[in-house]
């Protein structure tokens, strides 16, 4: 099922971009590529696909070379967009050393965000990870106030309070399930440490990327190109430094009986990363980094529920309640942003007079 979805999404992604290229000649694609709701829908679909694909790779074959997997995804992404550019379907700017130097901190933050995310998931259940990920939205929102002149309304603040409350409930449900076992509590707190590190690195990545996009006037494929090109060497270096490349572990990750299948699925997951890379940059560009993060948080709620059902996560009153409180926070925030946009639209004619 995961393979079929990946193939279909890849075909749709290719067809849509080809159609956009044709439409662009007639000036018909601008309304689509600059449409916020369309970018949000595309980001949701691609992020769900990416999560399912990665879970299939790591879960089905007990894969533990995460840095190497991410490096393969980056390499496949680069080859894919280079092929699309060669066919005249997409375009992006040529490599520039000065731009690469300015963009390198973003690539480093991307690697840090991915690594801390994988470490948090190693020690925390999927529902708890998902709920605590919402705290990133608060960091991004106040980062936008400082850097981009954003505004936090009373209703948005209320949604942030609900996010914090959902995290507290999730923590209580997690500790209630763990009990007083010292070893398990130690691993749990270690997971929370990685989770908070991931929240800060994720917020820094999104905010700095948005600021750099404004300064460099990067388009979506420019952002994808530099993110993958600069993160690839970092991922390879970190893989060889921190991951187990012994023959025993290699045989565990690439068993002879399904080695070809494992390699194929790794490449397929890299192809699916093209969609999430493009849609992430697209969503940040045409909406806001806070909206992008909130959409991602809401999009993770179905994954959190699947964690309760399929992944042996703690199922109790508190864990289930935390998911729905987090969802309620997302609804509150969506309504708050909608009201704020309407108010801004009404103020614009007055400001122009």
From Swiss-Prot:
Subcellular location: Golgi apparatus membrane; Cytoplasmic vesicle membrane; Endoplasmic reticulum membrane
One CC-aspect GO term: Golgi membrane
Mitochondrion among keywords: no
Major location (coarse): Golgi
Ranges of the Lumenal topological domain: 53-66, 123-125, 173-187, 249-262, 314-316
Key words of the record: Cytoplasmic vesicle, Endoplasmic reticulum, Glycoprotein, Golgi apparatus, Membrane, Sugar transport, Transmembrane, Transmembrane helix, Transport
Glycosylation sites: 260
Ranges that cross the membrane: 32-52, 67-87, 103-122, 126-148, 155-172, 188-208, 228-248, 263-283, 291-313, 317-336
Membrane topology summary: Multi-pass membrane protein
InterPro entries (UniProt xref): TPT_transporter
Residue spans, topological domain Cytoplasmic: 1-31, 88-102, 149-154, 209-227, 284-290, 337-353
UniProt record similarity statement: Belongs to the TPT transporter family. SLC35D subfamily.
Protein's job: Involved in the import of GDP-mannose from the cytoplasm into the Golgi lumen.
NCBIfam families from the UniProt entry: nst
Subunit-structure text: Homooligomer.
Protein name in the entry: GDP-mannose transporter
UniProt organism field: Meyerozyma guilliermondii (strain ATCC 6260 / CBS 566 / DSM 6381 / JCM 1539 / NBRC 10279 / NRRL Y-324)
Upper taxonomic lineage: Eukaryota, Fungi, Dikarya, Ascomycota, Saccharomycotina
């Amino acid at each position: 099922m995961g393979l079929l979805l990946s193939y279909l999404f890849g075909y749709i992604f290719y067809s849509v971009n080809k159609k956009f290229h044709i439409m662009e000649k007639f000036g018909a694609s601008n309304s689509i590529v600059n449409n916020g709701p369309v970018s949000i829908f595309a980001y949701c679909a691609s992020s769900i696909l990416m999560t399912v694909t990665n879970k299939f790779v790591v879960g089905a074959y007990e894969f533990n070379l995460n840095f190497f997997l991410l490096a393969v995804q980056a390499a496949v992404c680069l080859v894919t967009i280079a092929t699309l550019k060669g066919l005249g379907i997409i375009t992006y700017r040529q490599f520039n050393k000065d731009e690469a130097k300015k963009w390198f901190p973003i690539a480093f933050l991307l690697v840090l965000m991915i690594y801390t995310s994988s470490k948090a998931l190693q020690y925390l259940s999927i529902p708890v990870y998902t709920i605590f990920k919402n705290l990133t939205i608060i960091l991004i929102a106040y980062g936008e106030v400082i850097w981009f002149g954003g505004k936090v309304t009373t209703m948005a603040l209320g949604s942030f309070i609900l996010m914090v409350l959902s995290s507290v409930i999730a923590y209580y449900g997690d500790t209630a399930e763990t009990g007083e076992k010292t070893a398990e509590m130690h691993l749990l707190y270690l997971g929370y440490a990685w989770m908070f590190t991931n929240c800060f690195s994720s917020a820094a990545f999104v905010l700095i990327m948005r600021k750099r996009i404004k300064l460099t006037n990067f388009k979506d494929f420019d952002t994808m190109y530099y993110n993958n090109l600069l993160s690839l060497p970092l991922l390879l270096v970190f893989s060889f430094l921190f991951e187990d490349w012994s023959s025993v572990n290699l045989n565990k990750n690439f068993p002879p009986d399904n080695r070809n299948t494992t390699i194929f699925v790794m490449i397929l997951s890299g192809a699916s990363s093209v969609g999430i890379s493009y849609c992430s940059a697209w969503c940040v560009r045409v909406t806001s980094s806070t909206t992008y993060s909130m959409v991602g948080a809401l999009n993770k709620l179905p994954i959190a529920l699947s964690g309760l059902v399929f992944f042996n996560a703690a199922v109790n009153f508190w864990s289930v309640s935390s998911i729905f409180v987090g969802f309620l926070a997302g609804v509150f925030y969506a309504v708050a942003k909608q009201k704020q946009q309407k108010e801004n639209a009404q103020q614009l004619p007055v400001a122009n007079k």
